[in-house]
């Protein structure tokens, strides 16, 4: 990525947009791959699942979700792996769970890093074959479009946070507004305080002032840390250590019941182990090990690698 993202100003998103060539600008922000796994459903024509997949992929990828301008090679790579566990043909009702993943390229490198990876166990919606999807941000009355709009805003907001401190604030606020407007939808996953890992809890925590260190972590870890490692691995790792010891640690201290630090370390476990394994001082490695273990002891086999 060598256009506006490479000249991103921490103080102004607009300044970065000036770097774009009009001939290469694309309005769409996402490049999503939608996968529908319906192996658990027997005796049903697969046409409805194929049509659902095609309709969703067009809906997500062809829509301009924000006012921002992305070049084609800057679109955020993301995946929605939807597993259908129950299908009621008469009601057009799909009961599903979904794995949502988004990636971010690392500057001056062929490496891509995971921005977000989490399972939504309440991915239930209605869809009839050949339905046309329309989305009105001001009137949330369709569960399927609300689900994908939620994750579109969440992914774009997190991505922007990784290029400027709280750079995704406006987009994440739109995600929160959508979630508030979805409270009247008769589907699980939206309700405030019903579940500490549902859609409401995730976006509410991202915008919680007590978790601002977690937001800052996104910039410090990616932009100051990973993006620096191709030029100077030692300096990049030092920045990552500082990001973890301030942003991640402070977020856990400020909101010990928030699951954001745990979710983040769940999908960062391999990357973190590789960053520190066989590298850095023993003091640095011990400090990072203790921090990661205190946040997510279930991944201790990966944290043990940090100390090697």
Where do the language-model regions lie?
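A cross-kingdom marker for long, charged
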Residues: 35, 222-308
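Start-of-domain marker
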Residues: 28-95, 106-108
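Bacterial Sec-dependent N-terminal signal peptides
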Residues: 1-29
């Amino acid at each position: 990525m060598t256009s506006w993202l490479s000249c991103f100003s921490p103080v102004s998103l607009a300044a970065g947009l000036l770097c774009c060539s009009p001939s290469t600008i694309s309005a769409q922000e996402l490049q999503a791959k939608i996968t529908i796994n319906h192996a658990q459903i027997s005796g049903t024509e697969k046409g409805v699942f194929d049509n659902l997949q095609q309709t969703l992929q067009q809906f997500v990828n062809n829509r301009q979700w924000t006012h921002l301008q992305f070049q084609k090679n800057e679109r955020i790579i993301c995946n929605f792996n939807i597993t259908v566990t129950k299908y009621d043909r008469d009601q057009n009702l799909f009961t599903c769970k979904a794995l949502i993943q988004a990636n971010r390229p690392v500057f001056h490198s062929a490496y891509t890093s995971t921005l977000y990876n989490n399972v939504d166990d309440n991915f239930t919606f209605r869809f009839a074959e050949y339905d046309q999807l329309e989305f009105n941000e001001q009137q949330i009355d369709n569960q399927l479009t609300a689900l994908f709009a939620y994750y579109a805003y969440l992914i774009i907001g997190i991505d922007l946070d990784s290029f400027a401190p709280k750079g995704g604030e406006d987009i994440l606020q739109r995600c929160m507004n959508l979630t508030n407007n979805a409270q009247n939808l008769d589907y699980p996953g939206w309700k405030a305080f019903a579940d500490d890992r549902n859609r409401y809890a995730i976006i509410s925590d991202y915008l919680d002032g007590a978790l601002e260190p977690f937001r800052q972590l996104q910039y410090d870890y990616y932009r100051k840390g990973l993006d620096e490692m191709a030029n100077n691995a030692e300096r990049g790792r030092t920045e990552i250590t500082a990001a973890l010891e301030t942003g991640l640690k402070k977020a856990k201290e400020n909101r010990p019941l928030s699951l954001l630090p745990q979710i983040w370390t769940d999908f960062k476990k391999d990357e973190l182990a590789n960053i520190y394994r066989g590298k850095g001082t023993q003091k640095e490695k011990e400090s990072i090990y203790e921090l990661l273990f205190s946040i997510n002891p279930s991944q201790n086999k990966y944290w043990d690698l940090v100390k090697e």
